[in-house]
A protein has these predicted regions:
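Common nucleic-acid-contacting/processivity interface regions adjacent to the catalytic cores
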Residues: 132-253, 259, 330-393, 409, ...
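Short beta-strand
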Residues: 406-411, 469-470
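Active-site-proximal helix-loop-helix substrate-binding element of RNase H-like nuclease domains
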Residues: 4-11, 46, 55, 59-153
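Mobile, glycine- and charge-enriched loop segments
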Residues: 1-24
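Catalytic palm subdomain of template-directed nucleic-acid polymerases
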Residues: 415-451
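C-terminal, non-catalytic extensions of nucleic-acid polymerases
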Residues: 446, 450-688
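Proline-aspartate-enriched helix->loop->beta-strand connector
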Residues: 24-49
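Active-site cores of enzymes that catalyze phosphoryl transfer or operate on phosphate-rich substrates
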Residues: 1, 27, 282-365
């Protein structure tokens, strides 16, 4: 029996599973859903539901789920495992797990609902670890089993209430005039967008012809950074780079001139080597030319989408402003709905714009041409390297220096520039990050960006457009962050102590990180938090303060649980590395070896009824172990938590875990500023 403790829950008693399924089908018919969602519904809930109805009520009854009485099953290889899905024709499937992976643009250590609920809401699933498996929970505590399932539904509902990914998917689908499921695929969505756009213009789209991708094309430019510490850094970003490159160079299938390209290297173009370009042609960065006498349909579509997004974003911000002052409850509700509508519309336009290049660079796209794809990527390289040269020339001239590289790093559409020399020349007494004069410097740099750098950048990009005989000048670069300190360790690996981001001034500086273990999902959460805290000391404190922090954190770390200190990983190729004689083969990756050890142990100890084995494609956590120990290996992986029956809690190699999860990532950063994470004994201190 189930006792109801909440007004928003209704329980319907069923005499058996057949009765339950019949009542469910009756409810399904009355609701008549258009969309089915949940967490991993594609490969679990939907096929399970279809299979149970088929087995107990027959295939004909299972087909009642579909308004067209059609259900198609499909097998798919996912991370080494064969997964079966069931397509209920007439009911769209928007698996929230897929929506989250597609539209959040962040890598998580796990995509289990338990973890995502904690990340997004600070809530977790109901813990049933004392029962081992859901089957045991179902048999021994039916009340908790029902509450567990209710909580699962609530987590998905609350995540969507916060993120509104279903609303965004619907906005994308309606705007592009595609089926809901098509929002996952850039190629199909853009194929329909272009088809409808040209159809309105009275143009029939050519048949799809797949030629194959005969070679790779160049990607974005990433400068080798100036490794180390840099003070007073500003970053400048190009706005929607690839869509604007398509607009600037009029890149489109019907404007492409199929002729021998100009034999100019990217360095020739960066240094503005003289070149004669006919007035009716646009020169792209890969030497290809595009017509200038007509406006291509792709640039027109990009411009309209961009303009629509600007309008929607402006309407959203206006509604948000009105909401702050509104007191009438009914009007407030209307404004909230307006905000939601315009937010989803502008996000849909943003997704469409950003996915355009992804479609153009896909060999299965109707309009794919490697020369046009290369024109876009090399155009991006030219834009960022052109402005790097110009900014360096400008700052060397202003500061009366010669050939000093003020651009610390650049990445696809961003420049990171040090203004330390400028700051020290203006603030004669000298000013350092974290000092009382910091805000004066931030204000000064903000004015420098607005009044000097941005106008100079606009002028420089106009020179580039004129040089290439561009259809239009579309490169817009604005200041993003102002940081009093930054540290680079390698390409795409940096930390910035940000005081101002796009005009938003912080009361306390915030760390912006890329490629650092503190933002990597493969680092234990306890270490991610500690690395962030340690980096704040690196940015604003002293070496001895950091060493005290590390000493305290080591104590915290060594008292933490297996699950807290273990490395999160995704596991694959378990079957490939399994060996019947020795359990695992030579050169087996450490986390896969740990998974094989775990599976072997729960089988050997007859625990498979209580604990599930680790399967292909699952997320696991692994820890190094001290030897000797009960499992006779120096590593163990677990799917969720460590079974106490294995008896290895006392054998966790905390020192090795601490070194690999915390000290080694910190050392990469600290080496660049010549700091030590821990105090080291010297001869002087040894002899007093």
């Amino acid at each position: 029996d189930y006792e109801i403790h909440r007004e928003d829950v209704k329980a319907l008693r069923c005499k058996d599973e057949v009765d339950l399924l019949l009542k469910f089908l009756d409810l399904w018919r009355r609701v008549d859903p258009d969309i089915l969602t949940g967490w991993n519904t594609t490969f679990f809930d939907t096929p399970y539901l279809v299979n149970r109805i088929t087995q107990l009520l027959g295939e004909k009854m299972a087909k009642e789920l579909s308004p067209w009485k059609l259900i198609f099953k499909e097998e798919k290889e996912v991370q080494g495992r064969t997964q079966v899905s069931a397509k209920i024709v007439g009911v769209s499937s928007l698996d929230y797990l897929d929506l989250y992976k597609k539209f959040t643009y962040t890598q998580q250590e796990s995509y289990r609902l338990d973890h995502i609920g904690y990340v997004e809401l600070g809530e977790k699933k109901i813990d049933y670890s004392e029962y081992g498996t859901l089957q045991t929970l179902y048999v021994e505590n039916h009340q908790k089993f029902i509450e567990y399932n209710i909580k699962d539904v609530e987590l998905v509902v609350n995540i969507d209430a916060k993120m509104k990914l279903i609303d965004m998917a619907l906005a994308l689908a309606y705007d592009a005039k595609v089926n809901y499921e098509d929002v996952y695929t850039q190629v199909r969505m853009w194929d329909v967008l272009i088809h409808n756009y040209l159809w309105k213009e009275g143009i029939a789209v050519s048949p799809k012809r797949f030629k194959g991708k005969d070679s790779q094309y160049v990607g974005a430019y990433v400068k080798e950074p100036q490794v180390g510490k840099h003070d007073w850094v500003m970053s400048f970003d190009l706005n929607s780079l690839y869509p604007h490159l398509i607009m600037q160079y009029n890149i489109s299938p019907e404007t492409f001139i199929d002729d021998t390209p100009y034999s100019l290297s990217i360095d020739d173009l960066i240094n503005a080597k003289p070149v004669e370009i006919p007035q009716d042609k646009v020169l792209a960065a890969n030497g290809q030319c595009f017509r200038r006498d007509i406006h291509g349909f792709l640039p027109q579509m990009m411009q309209r989408m961009y303009d629509d997004r600007v309008i929607a974003k402006k309407a959203m911000l206006e509604a948000e402003g009105k909401l702050q002052e509104e007191t009438d409850p009914q009007r407030k509700k209307q404004l909230e709905n307006e905000i939601s509508k315009y937010k989803n519309l502008q996000l849909a336009k943003k997704v469409q714009l950003n996915s355009a290049y992804g479609a153009l660079g896909n060999e299965y796209f109707r309009f794919f041409d490697i020369r046009q794809a290369t024109a876009i990527t090399m155009g991006g390289q030219l834009s960022i390297r052109w402005i790097e040269r110009k900014v360096n020339e400008y700052l060397n001239r202003i500061l009366n220096t010669q050939e000093i590289d003020y651009v610390i790093a650049s990445d696809t559409d961003s420049l990171y520039i040090t203004f330390d020399r400028l700051v020290q020349s203006v603030f004669k007494k000298g000013v350092s990050p974290g000092s009382n004069d910091s805000q004066r410097v931030i204000n000064f740099l903000d004015r420098v960006a607005k009044e000097k750098l941005e106008p100079f950048i606009d002028k420089s990009y106009q020179e580039l457009a004129d040089y290439m005989n561009a259809y239009d000048q579309k490169m817009q670069m604005k200041r993003e962050v102002i940081a009093d300190r930054g540290i680079w360790t390698a390409k795409k690996r940096y930390i910035l102590n940000v005081h101002d981001s796009e005009g938003v001034r912080y009361k306390e500086p915030k760390l912006k990180m890329m490629g650092i273990e503190a933002v990597k999902s493969s680092t234990p959460e306890i270490c991610r938090t500690a690395i962030k805290d340690a980096l704040k000391i690196v940015m604003m404190g002293k070496e001895h303060e950091l060493q005290e922090f590390v000493l305290d954190f080591r104590k915290t770390f060594t008292s933490a649980s297996f699950e807290q200190v273990a490395f999160p990983r995704g596991v694959s190729s378990i079957h490939k590395y399994r060996d019947s004689a020795s359990l695992y083969r030579k050169s087996t990756p450490i986390h896969v070896r740990g998974s094989l050890v775990y599976n072997n142990e729960i089988t050997r100890r007859k625990l498979t009824q209580k604990y599930e084995e680790i399967n292909e494609g699952e997320k696991i956590k692994f820890c190094y172990l001290k030897m000797p120990n009960p499992v006779k290996e120096n590593v163990l992986s677990v799917p969720n938590y460590l079974p106490p029956e294995l008896g290895i809690s006392d054998y966790i190699d905390y020192d090795k875990q601490f070194d690999k999860a915390f000290l080694e990532p910190m050392k990469v950063i600290l080496d660049t500023i010549e700091w030590e994470a821990e105090r080291t004994a010297s001869l002087e201190s040894f002899f007093g």
